[in-house]
Design a protein with these regions (language model features):
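N-terminal hydrophobic or amphipathic helices and topogenic motifs
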Residues: 1-14, 31, 168-179
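Short beta-strand-centered segments that line the small-molecule binding cleft or hinge
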Residues: 3, 7, 19-56, 136-140
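Short loop/turn segments at beta->alpha junctions
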Residues: 19, 73, 106-107, 125
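A ligand-binding cleft/hinge motif common to bilobed small-molecule-binding domains
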Residues: 24, 28, 37-44, 92-95, ...
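Short secondary-structure boundary segments
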Residues: 39-40, 62, 86, 125-128, ...
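Flexible hinge/capping segments at coil-to-helix
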Residues: 48-56, 60-82, 164
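Secondary-structure junction motif
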Residues: 67-106, 112-113, 160
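A late-sequence structural motif
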Residues: 140-179
């Protein structure tokens, strides 16, 4: 963001939150020019630059016995209630965990609130745990959990000089370098 502001001081960069379910449609419909997306995503008609893999974490009530460990493995989750939401991006299941007696919650925020009440645990990418952090929950890295791959994506037919400039910044080009 800072590099963009330095190079393009007259062009505001607006961050628009997208769900995994709507990320591709937002790009194709032109609602956004470029997006950070979670993979997998249908790549047809899109340009993608893989950026990084996000570490999975177990979100738990702050007083959970699981919080005594620095990191966890799937085996550590046996006997826990594994809470998922409809916008769950990992679809993680662990042997020995149980599903709650209630329907899947609507959002990740709902799942974290339910975890805070001591009902169970949730597994999600670290950025989502940080986004929905509360004083009454904590999280630990899940060593053998699934990563969430993040990429930069834009409509291949709708590249503009501003999109090219942003891609250049992401790729580490200097202000004076060219493609």
């Amino acid at each position: 963001m800072r590099t963009w502001e330095e190079r393009m001081p007259r062009t505001a960069l607006e961050l628009i939150p997208l769900t995994v379910a709507t990320q591709r449609d937002a790009i194709v419909a032109g609602a956004v020019d470029i997006a950070l997306v979670r993979q997998p995503i249908d790549r047809e008609g899109l340009q993608l630059i893989p950026l990084y893999d996000e570490v999975p974490v177990v979100v738990m009530a702050a007083d959970s016995t699981l919080s005594a460990a620095d990191e966890l493995d799937a085996a550590d989750l046996a006997g826990e209630v594994l809470i998922a939401s409809r916008d769950d991006v990992l679809g993680y299941t662990a042997p020995g965990t149980t599903t709650p007696a209630f329907e899947a919650l609507e959002t990740t925020a709902d799942a974290v609130a339910t975890v805070a009440a001591g009902v169970g645990i949730a597994v999600m990418p670290m950025s989502l745990a940080r986004l929905h952090h509360r004083k009454d929950v904590t999280y630990r890295v899940l060593r053998d959990g699934p990563v969430s791959s993040i990429a930069l994506a834009w409509d291949a037919d709708r590249a503009t000089p501003l999109v090219d400039a942003f891609v250049g910044i992401v790729r580490g080009r200097t202000a004076n370098s060219s493609r």
